[in-house]
């Protein structure tokens, strides 16, 4: 227990600067106590330096400790995990080596993970400054001390933030457990400049009779053995050594105490801006330097600890050119505002070595670039994600779940952000207007795409468009092939095809292949094909594995990509979102619309060298050239029949599988092809879209119209369909189907067989007539 010599207000006297700062923050009209608005770093200092006082009693002392601890840890705002992290962080910083603790200055440390990442980044540096000496002359380390004493041959004047304050200096010495710190010797005061500390006159008394003695008494009277904080003794002794030199009159009313080294909370900067003549060091509060009187007779000079701040330099001579050997200056540097991060210390990724100034950016980089950190795996396609919420959104692409519905039109979306963008289309006025043509857009991205069209000069300036008019779909055209795109990003992806073809034709050396491999780092191990993005490689791998993770719930058909499933589902729903702005014809796919737009006078840069026919796309030209060469690369695995196009093969395979995906809504009749379904629907609606301009007669099919036009042809006029001649007998036919039926007579082929008796026929109609005999049905 402490003796009665310990004053009752020792706690308030020792940290009077801190309390005065808090009293300044609270206005005189505020009825609340200053302690009720303590910042965490202030409450932390009061909590650590609290001393038991006889007049308060044990219950009041315990209550005071609880109050200070509550202001420091803030259990109403922080969770148990956060409070534990604050305690662990404080202890972790106290056990760090001095040279590592010095490198952490200026960093807003919030948890132990940030400290670990910063220390790992320091160890990875090829070369860094040597360790700084933080040990006092007794050999005790004080890594968390806010006060260090340094003895040099001369003292210097350092500008401070408070005008004309007086402080006595104290000679540093090693204090034993029973020694009492020496009293400061009175010296002649010298006039000091504004903003500097000067030595006090001998008439002033210190704040307390001896903080060092108080701490020693606490240590001697403690019945609990060693302190749980090994650094408390050295730190508190140094703090008491400086506080002992301060008098209550020396504490300015508007003094701002340095922020706590742990960086808890943020300090409001003072209204008065402090001007410092020295260059700033770290953003942490630079430790207080006390220049001891090394020139005084009879006092041996002893080396002491250096300053923590790397930017703090030893002070030089005064303004008059003479060394201030007869006075001592206490240098107090205040951290201004929130600590600024040190640009030399950054968060480094342990996998690739990329550095980031913030921890949040490092975590986002690890989730995006390193799949090992993506612990949430999709069981359908094998794609991994860093968060469960992203996996939940991704699963909706497989299940086609669309929980967000528009209350105006009923359109459904997978994500709420997509619904928010869609709701902008229902608003009365557009939010973004084009400054050149006045056209309005609901989304900023649409306006940016529209402005790119103006910049490219691909089309003339458009007039302001009313809301009822549909916006044109194509904004950007490819200068190589004339293909149109709605987005500039799609055009950029398309231009890579031309660039790849050009590189392949121009250079075949190893250098060009090396450059192409650099642009396409993701290579397929089966076929060697390279891709620019990893997701493209994942989608390509399904071609080799045969995996089709996206299935249609209506017909059960599966696809390798989700975009293919979305396009396929429009077959069942009948949705055709892409309409031609000129003729109004609608299409299921955007590519079909782009192909259709070429029929309205679009550019056709690709020409056939044999017949001169022109095409708008290279794939259309390649498909047409197979009609000249007779090439049929697509073959049926069942019957071996060849086809020039994969679409024709898919249509043919439905004959073997019996699949008829297209059903009539009126009678339920099913068809293999959508064209047959469209032709059948005309029998219900009575539509006859093909009309003869000569007699006005209309037909359901275009073939019927062409056959009818042959009846109007004059003897010298060329018929709509030239006559078909048989190469065997020379017989001619007006229709190609009749010629094919006639050729069966010469070949003797009978492709239609009866499954019951095995009899074969040359025509399908003959087989149908024969089947009625088995069913005992007659036509007449």
UniProtKB/Swiss-Prot annotation:
Methylated at Gln-483 by N6AMT1. Residues 56-126 form the SCAN box domain. It is found in: Nucleus. Disulfide bonds: none annotated. Changing residue 483 to R: Abolishes methylation by N6AMT1. Keywords: Disease variant, DNA-binding, Intellectual disability, Metal-binding, Methylation, Nucleus, Phosphoprotein, Repeat, Transcription, Transcription regulation, Zinc, Zinc-finger. PROSITE patterns: SCAN_BOX, ZINC_FINGER_C2H2_1, ZINC_FINGER_C2H2_2. Its main location: nucleus. The modification Phosphothreonine is found at residue 268. CDD domains: SCAN. This is Zinc finger and SCAN domain-containing protein 10. It comes from Homo sapiens.
